[in-house]
Amino acid sequence: MAIPYNTTNTGTSIRDALGHSSIKVSGNWQHIENINIKHSGSWQDTKEVYVKSGGSWRKVHEGEHFLFQATLSGAQNEFNLGTWISGQGYSGNKIKGAIIVEGAQQRVNMGNFSSDSKVYLRINANCRIAGKGGNGGSRGGQNGQNGQRALYSRTPFIIDNAGIIAGGGGGGGGGNNSNCVYQNTNYFGCMKAQQCSELVQNQSPAYGGGGGGGAGTPGGSGLDGGQNGQALSGGGGGGDDGCESYSGGKGGNLGQDGDGAEGGNGGSGGTKGTAIDGISYRYSQSGNGNGDIRGSQIN
């Protein structure tokens, strides 16, 4: 299979980072994918090639892996590498290739391929992988929803992040409701044709504001006057009706928790989404390295 990527970003060759073998042809080094050896008079393709250097054997070539490049221009749904690879007609577990993010992509799942697989993950400048923002809590003291995860991997990967990887912001908490209490004077006929009066206490509902949506791709929805979350910033909370009702909390910015309702009187803000679930599977950094990561990094 021909190598499907020949990309250099910020001076870093993806082919070099993924460990493709090279040979010198007419004074120039060229990457190769297949190495054949002559055995018993016939040329045979090799799966692995080792050389002895300094008394130790070192692997210099792998030929079993499915090679790929997936370019993501931005989508409002998760990109699942395993599903995409299956769609290319490959059902094995050994892969080597590149994912290039060229827009605002909601969530990337790089699956659980073999331990000798490698994925070069490149996020271009002004591009991002982000989780969905949490929805705001409704008025009456409901909690904001949590933001969603951005990146998941149980496959070894190389990170080259010139953009942003961020969990979705948490939604803001909804403010408590209350009642406005007021008095009316009621008049009525009484003895000897006189008019009498009495004070009557009445009340009417005073509603709190809903929470704002968390930032993300897409942003979370604001409720009951709360604003929707945007790509990078959370939406403001909805206003209150007074009379000890309370405003909703602001949705969290990208990779941040949502705020609770005004003065702690109402729902709690949602938790920020995880930026990377599978950071221990990061094989190495290349180019821009980790770059701008917003949110927790686990596993």
List where the protein language model places each region.
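Glycine-centric low-complexity/flexibility signal
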Residues: 4-17, 97-104, 124-281, 286-299
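Generic detector of isolated residues embedded in canonical secondary-structure elements
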Residues: 48, 120-122, 275
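A structural detector for beta-sheet-dominated domains
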Residues: 26, 38, 52, 69-73, ...
